[in-house]
Amino acid sequence: YVTALMRLMGYDNLIHTYTANDIFVDIPKDAEYKDSVSLAFALGILKDDYNGYFRPNSPIKYNDAIRLAVRALGYGEQAELNGGNPNGYTWVASMLKFPCKTADTPDTLKCDIARLFFRCTEVSQKEPVKWASDYVVYAKEGRTILEQADIISDEGVVTANYISNLKESAATDRETVKIDNVLYNIGTTKASDLLGCKV
C-alpha cells in the first residue's frame, strides 16, 4: 500500500534515489518496498504508530489507509488538531469526501483502496514546502494529482466517434471522440465503442 501511495503522489523518482534507513525492525534489508517506506517516513506520511514495527505481512486496515492518505495529501496536521487518530483523521476523511468501505468486513478490499486512490486524485493536495527532522510544513493551496498530470476528468455523453455522430453529420478520426460535442483524444480508453453512452 505504501509503495502504491507514494507512486500515486508522484514520488516515483524520489523513491529510487532515497537511501533507506532501518526505521522498522521487521522490514528485511533486501525488501523491494524498503525505500518507499523510508521515504514515506521521512515525509511524515508514515509514522512509528506501532512501536518500531511496520507489520509488512499484515493486511492494511482501512483506517490506516485513510490516515496515510490524509497525511500524504498534506492534511495530517489538520487531523491531529481535530483529535488525531482515529477521530481527527475520520473527520478530515469525511471533509475530503473519502469513500466508505464497500463491505462490513475487517479486511480492506482492493476495490476500497482503488476507490480511495481515485478520490485522492481529485482532492486539492497541500504541497510540502519545508522539511525538518520531525515535521513537514505544507502550503495551504495546492493542485490535485489530476491537475499536476494535466489529466482532465469530466462526465458527458459520447456524441461522436470515428463511425458516426449523433448531433452533426461529420464523424471524428480514429484517435478522437466527442463528449458533449467537445473533442477529446481517446488515448488507451474504449470511448470510441461507447457512442450514446454516458462516460
Predicted regions and their residues:
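Feature responds to low-complexity, polar/acidic, surface-exposed segments characteristic
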Residues: 2-34, 43-107, 121-195
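Flexible glycine-rich surface loops and low-complexity tracts that mediate binding to linear polymers
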Residues: 112, 116-118, 191-199
